[in-house]
């Protein structure tokens, strides 16, 4: 295996023995370390442990496959260098054993264990793992059967449970609660014991005991947090009051407020409940603020407007502090604890019944699974536990595995749950001196609590085990911190450190971000001179959605902005403590969210366009070993959730011309094609369903329009569409109602139902068919098909039926012709796959399949659209932060940072926590009233704290995905007020990290980000210098804050003003003043911006007449023309003979390319000595049809054209890793050079930069000759080489009156910063063999082109061009043209 230079911490993780916890930060090379540790033990001469004696546990099959591949590659490399026969034999043996090695997911390990020892748990060896959808359906069926049995028994306890948790309509909420409780219990090591202990949380006889319990400690913490937030607000009010001109007469009252709240915080920490109640009553009794004014400035210095503002702001801050106390009152003190105690005991009985029913359900569910010979995923772990432990002690199987496995290695240890932890303990040795458990993970990236992951398992070891110190030795239990990041640029790492030093504390994030946790730069980015690399600040883009008019794409008017910004957003301020059910159907809120997402999407799209289209900077390509321009595929947009905004973003990006792909877990069932096919399946199963029937009739399957549907409905206003369809098919045809007709039974059934009104119906049918015969045609075509499909559904499998429908209707092919056809077809294939998977279960039939899908959707579940985008496609990708974990991207946009955290789960009346148990309200069943309970509050508060800690870790994961640049986007209502608040929060914090209470009060990511950025020494918000800013860790990090007030026009602005301790954002009219200075100059913009003259009217009488005719023509419209026949004939004649007054402009391009100009100059050169009759070519100034690249199916079968071969050679030269090879090229043997170049070409083919045919057209010898030539020497020795440099110039051509935009791409620009000059190099693949004077040919053919290149370099880079070089690949020779020579060629065509 290659020997990279390991850091001391990495080397310790590779070498040391014992039970090790490796805390591997993002990008620290944990996988490489794990593989090297394993490889070392396999190949070490002293150890040489067989690879199949290791258990390597990963969390995904992809990760397991990657690890197996890495180990295999390491073994292959070792084999290549092995010399000793014994060593070769050992390595070959390990290579063979690798395929049976236990490198697997934990579920796969459990499965293997169960299949080996199935007989010990009385499981059929042919068992299968149930699909999650099948398991859901089986759980639902089992629970419904169980409820029927309970209802039959009519037990009072169960009836009380239904009354408490059900509704007046049904018992679905109770069913959902039991299913949730069961799922949660199965994540515990002993589910039955955990359920049995739940009622203990409600068994209290004294308040003191309750307050000293875990639940009471959480209540204390909740009170302290709210009081802490109140004190911060009071501190802000106090600071405002003591400012010059402020309301100093408020100060005594504010001091008293702070004193009372400080005492309440002290009592919440250590007082009795009585002490807390007394202190709260005192703290909540806010006296009124004194009236009048006490001046702290002479009258001549007082600004009345500023004084009024300070008074209002101070009062507002104090009012917000009052609200924090009000929140405590509405939760902790809503019902006195003395009154709650008796109710708590009753709730304990209710919880006991709930636990009993859940256990009963668990037993019945197990029976149902055994009957079907299947298990679910939680069974795999619990059956494995049964095999490994008995009476909480290891079994013989466990001891056998402990003896067999030399070491157990666990990846992503921070994401395991207690059951998985117990399994790992049982298969590894735990005793001192023999411990062999190696755990790798990063608790800062633990973001899967919703999958029952418990980061506390990692945290406990991290806190208890000693930490490795460089130079230290092994210990029985040891933590090794890997904090060197080999992924990201230093600018990214420093910014992350600066932020998380301030916001990630043990109280808020469950781990403190300190020197051990902070990232250290470890990646080396190869430099190629002074390139426009991605080195730069982290950009933070903020906007107020109420201040931007989306319809106009710009800022709102001052009145609108003031009115709307000051009004609270819909639903804003709704706290989770209020325990209100979320109003998911709030249309106004949904519309507001969509509008905000649309604004943000446009801002993000504009930033991406600037980056990609203007080639703002280049990124480092690891495979290439060099820099290249940013592509769309390099960019990823991360969001917390895509469910509600992905479609909005995709729409806006498509409008902006940015290719985009969003992989979501929603929206599948809402697509037209899936909805249409499901509607068809529904009417095949039951044709009496009117809504799906109407959907099918309106779909392309039948093709009726609304009018035709209305006519059908008019036949039977009280009937259904199926009956009208049958009557229309019959249409009075006696033959179709005879007994021998194939649809006799269907027709007779409907006719019999309407026998009395049949004559009238027949008249109606005939009338409709006479006036609309197309209805009859459509019905006659569709009805027989429908009957045939219904018969087929009874005798064929569901999957076969579905595929037959696709083929019989042609619908699968049809949707492929629509926009996004490939996506639509993929969605329909997913539906077919789902049907196949459904039939692999114990369930069968169309009806049950449709019922399964209905239940699936009724539970709020959905599927994402089928993926049709490959990894290498050049598109911007939208993914969730969870999906991005473990990945890295060159450019990362993190959007939606202003969206409120989702607290819906905390609104449930049944809250679950692994340590605190079940939290339910106090339920008065008789009066159907619910009150908050102290237990429910404690559970809710702990869940909220843990959820916030996870949100903090999610932010960390998102930020650490970026390799080169980070861009953060978020919205903030009342942005100016928010910035003021952030400043106050920052001023009130003297420490590096913000107080835990403040951090736990966050509602959005910006609540963390804003105060931290306010403290930056660069004064990002233009607030004035901030005290102690430079003392913060990593305060030298680079950030840029951009405040947007519009999304069209000149673009974003960054603007703020300082006013002592407060900030007031400029009004909307002044925000645009600095736009010009914020914009980045676009190459060529100066030359192309608005300088083209518009030809005015001449005084020529004919042109004047033509202009008048044009005006007359524009005036002639169908609405205004009122001419008699003669005048009409004259007008028609005049219009038909009208000629455009500026014919010379028709054949002139407004934009052209360097290649086209070169072609034109060659045409004039060729035709200067030719007679008109001898030239068959047309004038080059005429617009010609564009030429397109040949389709891939032609390219793959035809020989490449010379132009295509030239393009391939240019691409190969463009991507040569010059910087990587510069120092070693001269020392390498010729065969090594050729091998490197061949690998370079193969790499371009693998990365799909070149096709296989193009790669074959590139000669290794040509590339080697270039690098070994004089031109190659120039490339090696240049201070800076820029390749494929695009430009746009505005030029005046001698052959054209109007200016023209000229675009081109320069092959290479060699810059000398020391001499302040440049060379232009162009690579030519022309076949010049046998040409007598190639220099003359090349000079005549390409002189103008090089002249344009030189002009572009001098104008845009502000560097004089000394000379231009043509390198001819066919001759392996360079030709140098001095600047004066190309200037002459340029001036022959261009007016310089």
Curated annotation (Swiss-Prot):
Ranges of biased composition (kind: Basic and acidic residues):
305-319, 567-583, 1088-1113
Tell me which InterPro entries the record gives. Answer: AddA, DNA_helicase_UvrD-like_C, DNA_helicase_UvrD/REP, P-loop_NTPase, PDDEXK-like_dom_sf, PDDEXK_AddAB-type, Restrct_endonuc-II-like, UvrD-like_ATP-bd
Is Cell wall biogenesis/degradation one of the keywords? no
Give the CDD domains listed for this entry: DEXQc_UvrD
Q: Reaction(s) catalyzed by this protein? A: Couples ATP hydrolysis with the unwinding of duplex DNA by translocating in the 3'-5' direction; ATP + H2O = ADP + phosphate + H(+)
Compositional bias (Acidic residues): 584-594
What is the E.C. number?
Answer: 3.1.-.-, 5.6.2.4
The GO terms describing molecular function are: 3'-5' DNA helicase activity; 3'-5' exonuclease activity; ATP binding; ATP hydrolysis activity; double-stranded DNA binding
Where are the stretches annotated Disordered? 291-319, 555-594, 1051-1126
Q: Which GO CC terms are listed, alphabetically?
A: cytosol; DNA helicase complex
Q: List residues of the UvrD-like helicase ATP-binding domain.
A: 3-489
Q: Which residues bind ATP?
A: 24-31
Q: Which cofactor does it need?
A: Mg(2+)
Is Secreted there in the keyword field?
Answer: no
Domain UvrD-like helicase C-terminal, by residue range, is 556-886
A GO biological process held by the record: double-strand break repair via homologous recombination
Record-annotated disulphide pairs: none
Q: Which UniProt keywords apply?
A: ATP-binding, DNA damage, DNA repair, DNA-binding, Exonuclease, Helicase, Hydrolase, Isomerase, Nuclease, Nucleotide-binding
**The protein's assembly and partners:** Heterodimer of AddA and AddB/RexB.
Q: What does this protein do?
A: The heterodimer acts as both an ATP-dependent DNA helicase and an ATP-dependent, dual-direction single-stranded exonuclease. Recognizes the chi site generating a DNA molecule suitable for the initiation of homologous recombination. The AddA nuclease domain is required for chi fragment generation; this subunit has the helicase and 3' -> 5' nuclease activities.
Q: Which family does the entry's similarity section mention?
A: Belongs to the helicase family. AddA subfamily.
Protein name as it appears in the record: ATP-dependent helicase/nuclease subunit A
């Amino acid at each position: 295996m290659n020997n990279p230079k390991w850091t001391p911490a990495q080397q310790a993780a590779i070498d040391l023995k014992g039970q090790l916890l490796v805390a591997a930060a993002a990008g620290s090379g944990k996988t490489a370390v794990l593989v090297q540790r394993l490889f070392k033990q396999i190949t070490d001469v002293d150890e040489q442990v067989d690879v199949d004696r290791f258990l390597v546990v990963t969390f995904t099959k992809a990760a397991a496959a990657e690890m197996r591949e890495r180990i295999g590659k390491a073994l292959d490399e070792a084999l290549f260098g092995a010399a000793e026969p014994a060593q070769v034999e050992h390595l070959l043996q390990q290579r063979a054993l690798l395929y049976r090695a236990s490198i697997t997911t934990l579920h796969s390990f459990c499965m293997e264990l169960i299949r080996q020892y199935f007989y010990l748990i009385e499981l059929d060896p042919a068992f299968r793992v149930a699909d999650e959808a099948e398991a859901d359906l089986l759980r639902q069926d089992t629970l419904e059967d169980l409820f029927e049995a309970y209802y039959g028994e009519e037990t009072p306890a169960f009836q009380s449970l239904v009354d408490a948790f059900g509704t007046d309509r049904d018992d679905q909420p109770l069913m959902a609660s039991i299913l949730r409780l069961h799922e949660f219990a199965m994540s515990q090591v002993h589910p039955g014991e955990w359920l049995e202990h739940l009622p203990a949380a409600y068994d209290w006889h004294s308040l003191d005991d309750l307050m000293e319990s875990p639940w009471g400690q959480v209540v204390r913490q909740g009170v302290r947090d709210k009081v802490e937030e109140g004190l911060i607000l009071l501190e802000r009010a106090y600071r405002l009051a003591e400012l010059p001109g402020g309301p100093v007469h408020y100060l005594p009252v504010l001091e008293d407020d702070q004193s009372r709240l400080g005492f309440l915080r002290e009592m919440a920490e250590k007082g009795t409940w009585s002490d807390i109640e007394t202190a709260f009553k005192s703290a909540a009794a806010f006296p009124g603020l004194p009236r009048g004014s006490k001046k702290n400035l002479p009258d001549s210095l007082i600004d009345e407007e500023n004084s009024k503002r300070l008074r209002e702001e101070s009062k507002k801050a104090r009012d917000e502090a009052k609200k924090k106390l009000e929140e405590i009152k509405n939760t902790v003190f809503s019902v006195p604890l003395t009154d709650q105690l008796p109710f708590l005991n009753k709730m304990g009985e209710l919880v006991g019944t709930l636990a009993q029913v859940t256990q009963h359900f668990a037993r019945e569910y197990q029976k149902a699974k055994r009957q079907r010979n299947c298990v679910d995923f939680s069974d795999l772990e619990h059956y494995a536990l049964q095999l490994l432990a008995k009476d909480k002690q290891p079994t013989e199987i466990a001891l056998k595995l402990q003896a067999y496995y030399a070491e157990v290695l666990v990846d992503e240890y921070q994401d395991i749950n207690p059951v998985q932890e117990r399994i790992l303990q049982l298969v590894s040795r735990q005793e001192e001196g023999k411990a062999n458990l190696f755990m790798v993970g990063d608790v800062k990236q633990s973001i899967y609590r919703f999958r029952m992951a418990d980061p506390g398992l990692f945290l406990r070891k991290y806190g208890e085990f000693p930490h490795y110190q460089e130079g230290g030795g092994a210990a029985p239990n040891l933590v090794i911190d890997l904090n060197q990041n080999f992924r990201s640029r230093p600018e990214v790492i420093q910014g992350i450190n600066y932020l998380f030093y301030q916001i990630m504390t043990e109280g808020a994030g469950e781990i403190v971000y300190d020197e051990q946790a902070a990232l250290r730069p470890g990646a080396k980015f190869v430099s190629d001179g002074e390139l426009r690399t991605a080195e730069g600040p982290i950009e933070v883009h903020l906007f107020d959605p109420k201040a931007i008019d989306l319809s106009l794409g710009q800022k709102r008017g001052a009145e609108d902005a003031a009115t709307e910004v000051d009004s609270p957003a819909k639903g804003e301020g709704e706290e989770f403590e209020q325990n209100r059910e979320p109003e998911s159907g709030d249309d106004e809120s949904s519309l507001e969210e969509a509008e905000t997402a649309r604004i943000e999407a446009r801002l993000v799209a504009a930033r991406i366009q600037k980056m990609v289209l203007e080639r703002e900077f280049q990124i480092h390509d690891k495979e290439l070993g060099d820099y290249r321009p940013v592509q769309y595929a390099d960019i990823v947009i991360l969001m917390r959730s895509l469910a509600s905004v992905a479609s909005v973003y995709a729409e806006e990006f498509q409008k902006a011309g940015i290719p985009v792909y969003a992989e979501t877990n929603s929206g599948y069932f809402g697509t037209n094609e899936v909805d249409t096919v499901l509607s068809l399946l529904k009417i095949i199963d039951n044709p009496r369903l009117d809504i799906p029937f109407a959907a099918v009739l309106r779909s392309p399957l039948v093709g009726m329009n609304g009018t035709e549907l209305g006519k059908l409905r008019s036949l039977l206003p009280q009937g259904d569409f199926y009956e009208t369809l049958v009557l229309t098919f019959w249409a009075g045809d006696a033959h179709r109602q005879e007994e021998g007709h194939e649809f006799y039974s269907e027709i007779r059934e409907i006719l019999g139902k309407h026998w009395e009104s049949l004559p009238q119906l027949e008249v109606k049918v005939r009338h409709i068919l006479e006036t609309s015969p197309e209805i009859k045609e459509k019905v006659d075509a569709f009805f027989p098909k429908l009957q045939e499909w219904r018969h087929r559904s009874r005798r064929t499998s569901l999957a076969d039926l579905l595929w037959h429908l696709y083929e019989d209707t042609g619908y699968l092919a049809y949707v492929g012709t629509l926009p996004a056809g490939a996506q639509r077809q993929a969605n329909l294939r997913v539906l077919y796959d789902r049907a196949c998977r459904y039939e692999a279960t114990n369930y069968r039939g169309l009806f049950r399949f449709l019922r399964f899908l209905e239940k699936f959707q009724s539970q709020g579940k959905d599927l994402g659209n089928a993926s049709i985008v490959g990894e290498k496609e050049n598109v911007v990708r939208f993914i969730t932060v969870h999906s991005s974990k473990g990945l890295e991207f060159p450019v990362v946009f993190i959007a939606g940072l202003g969206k409120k955290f989702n607290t819906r789960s905390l609104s449930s009346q049944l809250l679950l926590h692994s340590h605190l148990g079940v939290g339910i309200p106090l339920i008065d069943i008789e009066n159907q009233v619910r009150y908050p309970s102290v237990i429910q509050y404690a559970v809710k508060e702990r869940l909220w704290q843990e959820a916030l800690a996870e949100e903090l870790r999610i932010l960390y994961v998102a930020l650490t995905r970026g390799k080169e640049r980070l861009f953060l986007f978020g919205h903030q209502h009342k942005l100016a007020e928010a910035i003021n608040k952030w400043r106050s929060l920052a001023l009130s914090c003297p420490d590096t990290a913000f107080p835990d209470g403040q951090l736990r009060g966050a509602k959005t990511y910006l609540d963390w980000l804003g105060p931290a950025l306010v403290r930056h020494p660069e004064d990002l918000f233009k607030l004035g210098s901030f005290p102690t800013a430079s003392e913060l860790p990593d305060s030298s990090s680079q950030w840029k804050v951009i405040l947007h007030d519009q999304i069209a026009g000149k673009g974003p602005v960054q603007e703020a003003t300082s006013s002592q301790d407060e900030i007031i954002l400029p009004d909307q009219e002044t925000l645009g003043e600095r736009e010009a200075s914020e914009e980045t100059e676009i190459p060529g913009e100066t030359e192309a911006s608005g300088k083209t003259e518009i030809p005015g009217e001449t005084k020529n009488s004919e042109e004047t007449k033509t202009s008048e005719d044009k005006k007359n023509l524009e005036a002639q419209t169908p609405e205004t023309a009122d001419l008699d026949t003669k005048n009409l004939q004259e007008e028609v004649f005049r219009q038909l003979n009208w000629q455009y007054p500026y014919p010379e402009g028709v054949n002139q391009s407004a934009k052209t390319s360097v290649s086209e100009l070169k072609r034109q100059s060659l045409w004039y050169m060729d035709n200067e000595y030719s007679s008109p009759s001898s030239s068959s070519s047309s004038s080059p100034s005429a617009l010609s049809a564009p030429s397109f690249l040949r389709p891939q199916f032609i390219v793959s079968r035809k020989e490449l054209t010379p132009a295509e071969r030239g393009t391939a050679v240019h691409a190969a030269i463009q991507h040569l890793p010059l910087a990587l090879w510069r120092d070693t090229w001269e020392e390498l043997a010729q065969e090594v050079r050729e091998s490197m170049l061949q690998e370079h070409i193969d790499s371009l083919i693998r990365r799909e930069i070149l096709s296989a045919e193009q790669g074959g057209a590139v000669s290794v010898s040509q590339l080697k000759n270039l690098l070994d030539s004089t031109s190659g020497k120039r490339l090696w020795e240049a201070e800076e080489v820029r390749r494929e440099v695009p430009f746009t110039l505005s030029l005046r051509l001698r052959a054209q009156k109007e200016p023209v935009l000229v675009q081109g791409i320069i092959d290479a620009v060699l810059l000398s910063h020391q001499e302040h000059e440049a060379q232009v190099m162009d690579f030519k693949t022309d076949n010049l063999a046998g040409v007598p004077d190639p220099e003359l040919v090349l000079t005549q053919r390409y002189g103008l082109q090089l002249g344009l290149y030189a002009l572009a370099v001098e104008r845009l880079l502000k560097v004089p061009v000394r000379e231009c070089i043509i390198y001819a690949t066919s001759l392996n020779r360079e030709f140098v043209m001095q600047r004066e020579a190309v200037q002459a060629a340029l001036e022959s065509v261009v007016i310089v």
